[in-house]
């Protein structure tokens, strides 16, 4: 059994916990038992590809850790999962959830106070550490060495905040 398969199986046990923290209660749909879904037979999931190993596209299908979690939650609800890639800004702002575009968002989203004011989070299922990468032979050895330098980061992410 591969490590990815073992992790996926372990996450099946976490599906109810994940669901309790990330389902939008503002949707207009009904179905899935006591959970309101946009479409009664589908768990609509917003994500942002590419972000290996969490979510990325392969042969036109969104796959990865978050996709596996979405499938497990949908299976637990007795519905199918439909994953849609939207901009990370749409995830970060909560617009994907509040606009009725998705029931849940799964995209390796770091928990921040600003994000907690816009959406409910599940229990943390991945602890990330931020770092700035430089070439091995670089003279940069600390964040202070980057003062005034241009640093690349994805907009609206905790990585961007860290880089600032």
Q: Each PLM stretch: what is its role?
A:
Residues 71, 80-145:
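Acidic, polar ligand-binding/catalytic clefts
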Residues 23-26:
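Bacterial signal peptide processing site
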Residues 52, 62-76, 109, 127-164:
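Bilobed "Venus flytrap"/periplasmic-binding protein-like clamshell domains
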Residues 18-21:
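C-terminal motif of bacterial Sec signal peptides marking the signal peptidase cleavage site
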Residues 13, 41, 128:
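Residues that flank catalytic or metal-binding motifs in active/ligand-binding sites
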